[in-house]
Structures are given as C-alpha cells and as structure tokens.
From Swiss-Prot:
Organism annotation: Prunus avium (Cherry)
Family recorded in the similarity comment: Belongs to the PAL/histidase family.
Keyword Lyase found: yes
Stated name of the protein: Phenylalanine ammonia-lyase 1
Keyword Secreted carried by entry: no
GO MF annotations, alphabetized: phenylalanine ammonia-lyase activity
Main localization category: cytoplasm
PTM annotation, UniProt: Contains an active site 4-methylidene-imidazol-5-one (MIO), which is formed autocatalytically by cyclization and dehydration of residues Ala-Ser-Gly.
Superkingdom per UniProt: Eukaryota
Ligand binding ((E)-cinnamate): 261, 349, 355, 385, 457, 485, 488
Location within or outside the cell: Cytoplasm
Residue(s) carrying 2,3-didehydroalanine (Ser): 204
C-alpha cells in the first residue's frame, strides 16, 4: 500500500517517505500511538533491555528507541553507532536545495535572514551568518573548577549527539552528511564536547547547549571536549584524537541552524531517564511483593477480580506481577496458617501501603509508559526550523523545535517517580516499626542486645530525607515559563530543565530502592532467625514441661501435664523479638504468659490444689527455674548455629520467586546481615546496592524473579 502511494505522489525527501507520515486509516496518528502501548509493561522492559545490550545502534532516522540512546549514553559496553547509507541521498538533497535556493536569491529564514525577533534583518553572507549564530549562542557558563558543577553530564551530551544525528538523517534540515559522520566518530571514540548544564528553554530547541557541539565542529577556541580517560581536549586535539585530518568545518548556509535548532538535549536526557525509570518501576512492584512476604500479608489483595473490576491496565498488571511473586511463596503459606491460628493477632485487612500497592503503582506505570512512547516519538521526529521539503521545492516555517512533549512527559514522569517513592517510604516505615511489622524487631535490629543495636533507625531518617526531596521535585517545571528572546519565544517548553529535574528524581528513587531492598533482605533474615528461635523456644519449653510437669514426686502422672499444649500455644502466638534478648525476664511477655497458663490451669484444678502432690501451683517454681537455666543456653546455641550457616530450619526465601533479588544482594554484592555487634554500617551495604542499580547489574535479578510469568493473572476460581 505504501509503495502505491509513493508512485502516486512521489513525495520522498530522505529515509522517511511522506506517505508513511499520512496513513489514510490513521491520519492523526492516534492509532499508531495506541499500537505502541499494546502488550505488557514487563514485555516492554524486556525489549528495552535486549536493545540496550546490542553491540551496534544503526541510525536511519525513524526507529531510534530510548534504550538505544541509553546504551550510547553510558558507553560502558562499547556500543557503536552506524549511519544508514540509504539516508545519505536524502540528506544531500536537502543540503543541495539550500545552496541552490541561496544562489537563486531565495529569501529563507536563518539562511539570508537574522534570527528570532530580529529575523527582519537580511544578509547574503550565509556562511558568516552561521558562524555568528554559533558565537552568540555560546552563552553558557561552566565555572572555573571541576567542582563548580555547571557542565552537562557527559552521558546526557552523548545522548543529545545521537538524537541530533538521528533527526538530521531524515533529510529535512539542510546539512551535509559528512558533519553527521564526524559527530558519529566522536561518539564511537568516546570524545564528548563540553556543554553547559543550564541556559536552554527548549523552545527554539536547545540552542545554547547544542551550539557547543557546533563550536567543536567549527573549531571555536573556547570549545572543549573530554576524552575516554577523562582528559580535557581542545577542538583541534579532539579532531586529531578521532582521526579527522580534514580540518574544521566551515558551515554552509543553514547548517549552523540545523545543528542547534532542535530538542535533542532535552529528549536525549529524557531517554536515559526513562530507561532507568522503567526498570525502577518494575523493581517497585517486586519490592512491594517482597514487602507483603516479610510482613506476613494476606495475598488476596492481588486477586484478579478486584483489579479487573477497576479496569486500569497498569493496576491489573501490577497486581498480576505481585500475584506471580506471591503464588506458592513459602512466606504466604506460613502466614496463612498464622492467620487461621489467631485471626485477631493483627487487623483483618493489611494497611494501605501493602493492600493498595497495585492501585497506587498502576497509574504510575501507565504514566511512565505513555511518557516513554512520547519521548520515543520525539527522538524520531524532525524538530528544527525551517524544514526543507525538497519534493515541493519549499522551506516550511513552523515550530517543531518546541519541546513541549519533553517538558510535559518529564513533569508527569517526575510526579510518578515521587509517588513510587512515597509508597516505598510508607512501606519502609511500617517495616521498621515494631507496632506495625507483625513481630519483627524495632528498627530491624539484628543483634542480641537491642539496647546496643538501633538497626535501620538512621536509614529511616535518610529515607524521610530522600522522600521529602523527591516530593519537592514532583512540582512541575512547565508552569514556570518566562517570555524570552524579545518576546519572540514567549511560550517555551523548559524541556531540558524538566529532564534534569527528573534525572535528579531518578537518582533519589535509586537511593530509596537500594535502602529499601537492603532493609527487606534484613527482614528476610530476621524472619529466618525468628523461625529458628521460636523452634528452639518451643522445643525447650516442651522439654522442660515434660521433665517438670508430667509426673509428681513419686512418679505418678500429674495434672500439670495437660498444660504443655497451652504453653506451646503461647510460644507460637508471642512475638519472638519481644522477649528473645532476655527470654526468661519476668518483665518480658514470654515468662508472664507461660506463668499465666500455669496459673489458669491451677485455678481450674479445684481440690487438687490442696494436696502438694497434685498442686499445679507447686510446679510453677520448678518449671520456671529449670527453664531459666536451660532456655538462654539453647537460644545462644541456636543463634550460633544460624551464624555458622547450620540453622535447624532453612531460610524460606530459597523457595520463593523473589529469591533472585535476595541472592543478588547477599551473594553477588556481599551485602551482609547487619547487627550492632558488627562494624559494618547500613550505609555501606546500601551503597553496594545503589552502585549495582546505577550500573544496571540489578536488571537480570529483577527479570529472574518474573521468569516463567506468562503475562496474565492467575485464573479466577
């Protein structure tokens, strides 16, 4: 169908054929936009990861993705850029058209005219005009020291270079193909021009920062680049380093404008931000499921019918992912028995941070997915001005440089990130609070003496700090527009500013995710310790009960023998960490509740209590004294066995689908179980996880947790 359309109208500039831009059944592009959102978010993340790991990014102008931008931006794996040779003819055609129109005396914006509000000025010195354009746009400030922090991060610059090449390859901009080849050489040799961090409103594109790439290409004396080893290079040294011996470019008419008049810096940074955001969003769903496991939550909050009745796809998928993690979980099975045994031990319903986590995360996933597709459309767009339409022999004066999709998408993404962080903080706060966490110790303290172990108290304070800053960053950027450039640029997108703020938000969410994951691993190990200690206490109480309560002084069966079952119920129902640091203390609940059982049995013993040989009261002292001798030793032995890796009860996490993340933290990263008895601090362990998240090492463990999921909820039955 596309081929027939081409024959009918013949419109073709470069790599993008005009009929493809105007599909008859979808003239407004809504259908294409909707099509990109088909399938699950998990499948989309898997596709992103696969693309990110490919060794080559082939640019043709119309199929660049955010994952490819992220891959080139990091350069960690040595990914290379290749330009589609098929785009050369279209690029050359638009460049030739500009030169032809110049020779014919055609009046074209930015070619024979001034710029913006001063476009009423005229000149025939096209090359000199481009040189002046780059000079006056070099208005950024870097500061005199490396610590000044006024240079755009080099990853963002690399992303911008790639996106700008992709735009210019489409053949609507009037620039030579050779210039794009040189920018590609810079990328492939890891030589990155220095761009100012601030100074763009992303409305006539990212004029100021992009002018520094043009300055490097033209050899401006103030241009600097950074080499692969961090060395500072002048423009001449940069050209020599990448093997370009033909000298700097003398820009032809329109070429300077083609380089600077686009949204590549904002959309490039937005691409890297969204790649990370999609990974973190998926991680937040898994962390919510692990939170449900260690909190002994009720899994019915993931039931598909609940979410199907709400209709929102993000919510349905978030619930289905959590349902998959919890399905068959050993923690869930154990918690179910606990709830059946004592339904009044905790509230009938879990608190909102657990129970409504799919409803909370679902809309954020939807926002992130839509923003991802919006930015992918932007990085594959032609976004400068004027556009050269060779087929109709005209220059189109419009406003595709307006980066509103970037500003809006980044504002929305940042709000979604803040919401994810808010949920994470609420979950963390429940996890460390012994009033809410169903038997875990206060602050997740793992040591023997809680008076000398305050666990994650400092980490909770840090989480509050992270969350507060994240909520502040959620405020929109796009409502702070100022009229610029003599009121010509009177509305502007602030796309790069919003992207920068979203990059900050992503960094903070990484801090929160790493801290929360370390805390969850601590909680997993505490549940393991709890189970072993409870087992030890039960066995010890049972042994002591049999020795002291079964028979009387003459070997006859004693009425107190019937107390054992109720004594063991006390052990099952009492939170281990409420007494385990001093299990036989009279002020702790274990001894109080055990004595209460014996007293209650004694009160129902009737006339037998008057006889010393049948009195249960007479047995209490013997039971307690022997327990006080034996129990502390047994508890210490159980702790020692756990520390040496020979615990009597294995860690339930090994039977769970969430195990890959736990294994990654404990084994691959070496982040340890924390106690006040050790020197290691929480921050040191969180740092290991944070670094792994930043380096992308956590991606595989995340996907391993969801291996085998078919993309659908469990059937309703």
């Amino acid at each position: 169908m596309a081929t027939n359309s081409i024959k009918q109208n013949g419109h073709k500039n470069g790599s993008v054929e005009l009929p493809e831009l105007c599909i008859k059944k979808d003239p407004l592009n809504w259908g294409v936009a909707a099509e990109t959102l088909k399938g699950s978010h998990l499948d989309e993340v898997k596709r992103m990861v696969a693309e990110y790991r490919k060794p080559v990014v082939k640019l043709g102008g119309e199929s660049l993705t955010i994952s490819q931008v992220a891959a080139i931006a990091t350069h960690d794996s040595g990914v290379k850029v290749e330009l589609s040779e098929s785009a050369r003819a279209g690029v050359k055609a638009s460049s030739d058209w500009v030169m032809d129109s110049m020779s014919k005396g055609t009046d074209s914006y930015g070619v024979t005219t001034g710029f913006g509000a001063t476009s009423h000025r005229r000149t025939k010195q096209g090359a000199a005009l481009q040189k002046e354009l780059i000079r006056f746009l070099n208005a950024g400030v870097f500061g005199s020291t490396k610590e000044s922090g006024h240079t755009l991060p080099h990853q963002a610059t690399r992303a911008a270079m790639l996106v700008r090449i992709n735009t210019l390859l489409q053949g609507y901009s009037g620039i030579r193909f050779e210039i794009l080849e040189v920018i590609t050489k810079f990328l492939n040799n890891n030589v990155t021009p220095c761009l100012p961090l601030r100074g763009t409103i992303t409305a006539s594109g990212d004029l100021v920062p992009l002018s520094y790439i043009a300055g490097m290409l033209t050899g401006r004396p103030n241009s600097k680049a950074v080499g692969p080893d961090g060395q500072t290079l002048s423009a001449a040294e940069a050209f020599e380093f990448v093997g370009i011996n033909s000298g700097f470019f003398e820009l032809q008419p329109k070429e300077g404008l083609a380089l600077v008049n686009g949204t590549a810096v904002g959309s490039g940074l937005a691409s890297t931000v969204l790649f990370d955001t999609n990974i973190l969003a998926l991680l937040s769903e898994i962390l919510s499921a692990i939170f449900a496991e260690v909190m002994q939550g009720k899994p019915e909050f993931t039931d598909h019918l609940t979410h199907k009745l709400k209709h929102h796809p993000g919510q349905i998928e978030a619930a289905a992912i959590m349902e998959h993690i919890l399905d068959g979980s050993s923690y869930v099975k154990a918690a179910k028995k606990l709830h059946e045994q004592d339904p009044l031990q905790k509230p009938k319903q879990d608190r909102y941070a657990l129970r409504t986590s799919p409803q909370w995360l679902g809309p954020q996933i939807e926002v992130i997915r839509y923003s991802t597709k919006s930015i992918e459309r932007e990085i594959d767009s032609v976004n400068d001005n004027p556009l050269i339409d060779v087929s109709r022999n005209k220059a189109l004066h419009g406003g595709n440089f307006q980066g509103t999709p970037i500003g809006v998408s980044m504002d929305n993404t940042r709000l979604a990130i803040a919401s994810i962080g808010k949920l994470m903080f609420a979950q963390f706060s429940e996890l460390v609070n012994d009033f809410y966490n169903n038997g875990l110790p206060s602050n997740l303290s793992g040591g023997r003496n809680p008076s000398l172990d305050y666990g994650f108290k400092g980490a909770e304070i840090a989480m509050a700090s992270y969350c507060s800053e994240l909520q502040f960053l959620a405020n929109p950027v796009t409502n702070h527009v100022q009229s610029a450039e003599q009121h010509n640029q009177d509305v502007n997108s602030l796309g790069l500013i919003s992207s920068r703020k979203t990059a900050e938000a992503v960094d903070i969410l990484k801090l929160m995710s790493s801290t929360f994951l370390v805390a969850l691993c601590q909680a997993i190990d505490l549940r393991h310790l709890e189970e072993n200690l409870r087992n030890t206490v039960k066995n010890t109480v049972s042994q002591v009960a049999k020795r002291t309560l079964t028979t009387g002084v003459n070997g006859e069966l004693h009425p107190s023998r019937f107390c054992e079952k109720d004594l063991l119920k006390v052990v099952d129902r009492e939170y281990v960490f409420a007494y385990i640091d001093d299990p036989c203390s009279a002020t702790y609940p274990l001894m109080q509740k055990l004595r209460q059982v014996l007293v209650e049995h004694a009160l129902t013993n009737g006339e037998n209590e008057k006889n010393a040989s049948t009195s249960i009261f007479q047995k209490i002292v013997a039971f307690e004294e022997e327990l006080k001798v034996l129990l502390p030793k047994e508890v210490d032995s159980a702790r020692a066995a756990l520390d040496s890796g020979s615990a009597g009860v294995p860690n339930r996490i090994t039977e769970c689908r969430s195990y890959p993340l736990y294994k990654f933290v404990r084994e691959e990263l070496g982040a340890e179980y924390l106690t006040g008895e050790k020197v290691r601090s929480p921050g040191e362990e969180c740092d290991k996880v944070f670094t792994a998240i930043c380096e992308g090492k956590i991606i595989d463990p995340i996907l391993d947790c969801l291996e085998g999921w078919n993309g659908a909820p469990l059937p309703i039955c």
